[in-house]
UniProtKB/Swiss-Prot annotation:
The lineage of its organism: Bacteria, Pseudomonadati, Pseudomonadota, Gammaproteobacteria, Enterobacterales. Has three domains with a flexible linker between the domains II and III and assumes an 'L' shape. Domain III is highly mobile and contacts RuvB. Homotetramer. Forms an RuvA(8)-RuvB(12)-Holliday junction (HJ) complex. HJ DNA is sandwiched between 2 RuvA tetramers; dsDNA enters through RuvA and exits via RuvB. An RuvB hexamer assembles on each DNA strand where it exits the tetramer. Each RuvB hexamer is contacted by two RuvA subunits (via domain III) on 2 adjacent RuvB subunits; this complex drives branch migration. In the full resolvosome a probable DNA-RuvA(4)-RuvB(12)-RuvC(2) complex forms which resolves the HJ. The gene is ruvA. Keywords: Cytoplasm, DNA damage, DNA recombination, DNA repair, DNA-binding. This is Holliday junction branch migration complex subunit RuvA. The RuvA-RuvB-RuvC complex processes Holliday junction (HJ) DNA during genetic recombination and DNA repair, while the RuvA-RuvB complex plays an important role in the rescue of blocked DNA replication forks via replication fork reversal (RFR). RuvA specifically binds to HJ cruciform DNA, conferring on it an open structure. The RuvB hexamer acts as an ATP-dependent pump, pulling dsDNA into and through the RuvAB complex. HJ branch migration allows RuvC to scan DNA until it finds its consensus sequence, where it cleaves and resolves the cruciform DNA. One of its GO terms (cellular component) is Holliday junction resolvase complex. One of its GO terms (molecular function) is ATP binding. It holds the Pfam family RuvA_C. It comes from the Bacteria. Residues 157-205 are annotated as: Domain III. Residues 65-143 are annotated as: Domain II. One of its GO terms (biological process) is DNA repair.
Amino acid sequence: MIGRLRGIILEKQPPLVLLETNGVGYEVQLPMTCFYELPDIGQEAIIFTQFVVREDAQLLYGFNDKQERALFRELIKVNGVGPKLALAILSGMSAQQFVAAVEREDITTLVKLPGVGKKTAERLVVEMKDRFKGLNGDLFNNTGDIQLPASNSSQISDADIEAEAASALVALGYKPQEASRLVSKIAKPGADCETLIRDALRAAL
């Protein structure tokens, strides 16, 4: 199992990053809350990973620390929650916010996440509450919130950036029409892709 990668970032295409380690390029999917914190292309990054094997693919999911990965591992144990939905959940809100929503039994907030209906939200509350007891550390202090660094603007048109942001939302589980609506709702001139994705995810909640 691949549990940790250290290498140079070659490409960033939300929610995917290409990381070169010892001459090998690894494609890693990250929750957007983790993606925002990645360094720029060409810089070194350390990513904690979860290797997932499916019938048609072998996938790597990445996280900024072991606790975020531990939460992902617990999420995919919940009935009806696979890696794709777990990635969408942790993209839609920070780990702290998710823990807080579960502990408050806030079904209304949870159902706003892509792919989460009422029954899934109820299962998350029932099954995850007990699991939190084994997850320790500052990440699971539900009074906190993630701080998102500013990103550098690229030299492409606003329309292209908005299309890229909408594509990232589709990859996270939103329907194309809903993704476009969310991006259009929060779009502003000069905004970079990561800002649009972040603001769209916040608007969805």
